Amino acid sequence: MTADDGRRRDDAAAPGHDVPTGSDGGQPSPAGGGSVQPVLADEGTTSVPEPEPRPKADATAEVAVINKPTAIGFVAPALGLIGVFMMFPAVWALYLGLTNYRVTGTAAREPEFVGTDNFTRALEDPLFTSSLWITLIFMAFSGVVGQMGLGFTLAWLFRRWRGWTRRTIEVLVIMSWIIPGSVVAFLWRAFLDGEGGTLNSLIPGDVTTEWLLRQPLLAIIVFNIWRGTAFAMLLFDAALNTLPPSHLETAKVSGASTWQTLRDIVFPAVRGHMLTTALLVSMWTFNLFTPFLLTGGGPNYQTEVLAIYVYRVGFGQGDFGFGSAVSAVMLVINLIIALVYFRVLRDRRKKS
């Protein structure tokens, strides 16, 4: 050891200087277990600076949030529109249902409060009971069974189709949904007309059946199925796209039939979507007024659904108080239907 080497070792061992050692107390070992710290170097040597520590994320950093006045400002326009166009008419209709308000006469100028008389009158009216049953039949067969059944069938058959064929069929189905109801009703009146109607022309022989008079309820059911199937098909198509292709391929390889695949794989997977679609279709069909454009509620009240019944007593007879009471009853029925669907959906989620 030279004198210079000894002087450097003594300087490194002086107070304030750490001398790195290896695991055996000797010279530092680069590959040893201990960490090597840089030694202060004299002139002519290169010092190794210690790496700067990375800044730690501040757990208490402020998160950008919208204050309450700003949030209210964003929500206020939507709430205002809902209040003006939905809440106020509903409350006003409920108020009118408790009065004898009419379009003309003394009741129009000075309506009187009659309490629940209008509701009792509606429940005792045989035409109201008949309209309620017609509405439930119309909703069940044209909405739940017809639209959902045909919509799911089309979505299942077209799920693997690609190219212009699928696009053409989808356009044709969706056109029946986006065309205005008045135009569709005019087309169906021409289709079902007894003299020169398209349907009678397609049937062999000299057929002159007045379908809107002979089978009015069946006519509006088929009309509504044709009209609303596209909506159900779009919803079911989106639901089927969520199925993993491997599940269907496994069922195919194992030799499962189409019904077994639907029963054991498809239906359990899209049951939530089916309940949601059933709720939307049911409530939409229950409040539908379009059959009035086909039959006007006739013949002999055979197609008078509740929406047409309210129109007849409210606008036809000018009895706004009674018509508003029937509207409130329809609102309650809609709420009951919605609660039943929500209850079934909640029970399914609990079981799953």
Where are these regions (language model features)?
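A structural signal for multi-pass alpha-helical bundles of membrane permease subunits
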Residues: 67-352
